[in-house]
């Protein structure tokens, strides 16, 4: 009988200790979360990009993911964001995520949107986004960043993405015969992007070249092909168009992020006769407002 009472007392004491332990843990969690504020973060695609895709068959590809990473006041990843997190949503409807942040501290919030890990690697964080090893030129990608904390502590944050890449389109003013091999070389390009600083990283040794062999004729006043590059826009570049081995240089082209460059001219005879190419710079990527630079 004594043993049974002793066992009962021991069980009750153990239950009381467990209850106290759980209460302490709960109180610690409350204390840890004291002062944190829930914040809903929304990211929208650039509206001009959506317009381009809706009206142009050769528009940009649709992104399939948007990543977020939050940095502390020392530019180090916040706990839980050592690697970028995936936001909910789609390109058409935008992306969202709700987080809890300390309003007394300043946070740097980084965003990166692309078509997935087959195109860009983000394992080292959004300060070191890199192209996939098998790519010769980068794929479509968007970026944004914002600061939250201090005097900016709203319960909702909205950011609009911009293109991290520059898009280059070759446009012909004459019919181009099938079978031609065309290429465009950009001498100064990069293979990565630092979202926090908003600039490309890891310069290539020989630039980037995109080549295409035409399977069919390209009609007059049509786009021949497009591709993307990561470039810093620090200085204008001389691009080289090669037409079945014959070269044409296109000078004074400002290749930089969030800019669509349209190289326009007689592609059929480029490099074989004197051909003038015009570089039309679409700074809003899809708008009708362009800056024209003649070669």
Q: Which residue stretches match the model-derived regions?
A:
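Sec-type signal peptide cleavage vicinity
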Residues: 2-8, 17-295
């Amino acid at each position: 009988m004594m043993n049974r009472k002793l066992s009962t007392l021991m069980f009750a004491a153990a239950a009381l200790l467990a209850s106290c332990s759980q209460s302490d843990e709960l109180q610690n969690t409350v204390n840890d979360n004291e002062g944190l504020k829930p914040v809903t973060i929304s990211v929208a695609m650039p509206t001009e990009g959506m317009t381009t895709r809706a009206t142009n068959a050769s528009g940009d590809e649709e992104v399939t993911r948007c990543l977020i990473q939050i940095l502390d006041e020392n530019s180090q990843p916040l706990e839980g964001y050592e690697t970028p997190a995936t936001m909910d949503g789609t390109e058409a409807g935008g992306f969202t995520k709700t987080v809890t942040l300390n309003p007394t501290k300043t946070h740097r919030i980084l965003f990166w949107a692309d078509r997935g890990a087959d195109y860009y690697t983000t394992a080292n964080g959004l300060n070191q986004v890199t192209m996939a090893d098998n790519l010769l030129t980068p794929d479509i990608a968007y970026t944004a960043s914002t600061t939250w904390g201090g005097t900016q502590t709203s319960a909702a944050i909205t950011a609009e993405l911009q293109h991290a890449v520059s898009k280059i389109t070759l446009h012909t003013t004459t019919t181009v015969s099938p079978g031609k091999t065309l290429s465009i070389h950009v001498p100064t390009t990069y293979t990565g992007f630092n979202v926090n600083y908003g600039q490309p990283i890891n310069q290539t040794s020989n630039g980037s070249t995109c080549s295409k062999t035409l399977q069919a004729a390209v009609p007059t006043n049509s786009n021949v092909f497009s591709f993307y590059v990561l470039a810093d826009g620090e200085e204008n570049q001389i691009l080289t168009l090669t037409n079945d081995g014959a070269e044409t240089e296109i000078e004074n082209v400002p290749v930089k992020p969030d800019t669509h460059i349209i190289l326009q001219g007689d592609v059929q005879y480029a490099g074989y006769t004197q051909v003038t190419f015009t570089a039309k710079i679409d700074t809003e990527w899809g708008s009708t407002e362009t800056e024209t630079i003649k070669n």
